Amino acid sequence: MSVPGPRRRRAFLLTALAAVGIVVSAVAATAPAPVKAGPRNEVGPAASDDWFVWSKSREPRTSPLDLYAQQTGHAPFKVNPKNTQAYAGAIDGTTLAYQLIRGNLADRSDLRLYDLAARHLLPMPSGVNTSRWECCVSLSGGWLLFSRGHSYSRDRQLVLLRNLTTGEQRVLDQLRNKNGLASAGQISGTFAVWTKCSPYPVCHIYRYDLASGTTTTLPTQAGKVVYSPSVNESGTVYYGQSNQGCGKSVKPMRQPIAGAAELITALPKRRDIDITYAHRLPPRPPGDVVTTRVYYDIVRCRTHQWDIYSVDDSERIPPPSPPTP
C-alpha cells in the first residue's frame, strides 16, 4: 500500500500485568465509527483521553497537509508553522510528538515535541534530529520511538528508541535495501512495534519488550503483506494485512501476546489503511474488561480520498490466581 505524500520518507496496572505474563483474552470489537470524514483528506491519527491530533489537506484533493489538534469540547487549532507540513506521532499526557517537513521540495524532516495545553514547542534533546530524514515518531513514558533514513533508498535505515531523560539510545533494527523499508510504528508502556520489508513485499512486524529487552517477530500468513502496526500497553498489536496493491483483500488484524491473530473489523472493497494508532480507554467497572480504541486512516484507492475511523477492541483480564496454600 502506498502512503500519502512524504510521510514515510517521514497505565501502571496493565504494565504490571504484562510484566508478569498475565494474558488478556478478546471479548468483542465494535463497528467502525467515522472520526474525521470531511471533504478534505484527513490522515495520521493520534489520540489521548482528552486530545485528538491529525493531518488535514489544504485543498479537497491531494495537497500539502497541516497538523491539527483538538481538545474534547473545543475547536481544533493548527500546530505546524507556515510553509511546512506535519504528521502526528503520539500524545503522552499533553505532550505531542510529531514530524515536521520543510523545504520547497519537502526534502527535510525532523521531529518536534509540543505542549498541547500551552501551545508551544518543547526542547528536543540533542542527537534526535540530524541532517538525515527522521520520521514516524511515537512517544510513551519518556521513550521516543522513531525512524531515521529514507525508505526505498540506499540510505541506512534505522529504527531507534531514545530515552528523553537519560539519553540512552537503542537501535532496534536497521536496513540498507533500496527496495525495502524499516519504519517505526508505536510505543505504548513497555512495548514498541515496527515494520521491516526486505525487500517489499516481504514484510514482517516486530514487537519489542523494553522490560526484558527481547524482540518477537509476529507470525505472518504466507503470501500476505503486513504493515502499519500499533500496540497497546498489554502488548496486543494492531496492523493491516493484505495482498500486494492498494485495497487488495485488506484486513485490519489484532495479534495478542498469546494466541492467534484475529480480524477486528471488515473493510469495504478497494479501501486500504496507512496508519493505525492504539489508545487504551479509561477503565470502567467492574474493571475486568479493558478497551483499546484503534484509530486508522482509510483511503479510497480509486479517488485517493482519505478519512479517519476508529473501532473499539475489548479484552478481558482474567482474575488473579488464588494464592498457593
Task: Show the residue positions of the predicted features.
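Repeated scaffold domains used in trafficking and secretory/extracellular systems
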Residues: 39-48, 83-93, 129-141, 177-189, ...
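Loop/turn-rich, solvent-exposed surfaces of beta-rich toroidal or solenoidal domains
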Residues: 223-254
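An edge-strand/N-cap motif at the start of beta-rich repeat modules
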Residues: 28-69
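Multi-bladed beta-propeller domains
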Residues: 29-40, 72-84, 117-131, 165-180, ...
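Secretory targeting and sorting signals
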Residues: 2-32
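Blade-level signature of beta-propeller repeat domains, shared across WD40, Kelch, NHL, RCC1
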Residues: 273-325
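Structural motif
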Residues: 58-68, 102-112, 149-160, 200-206, ...
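Residue position within the beta-strands of beta-propeller blades
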Residues: 52-55, 96-99, 143-148, 192-195, ...
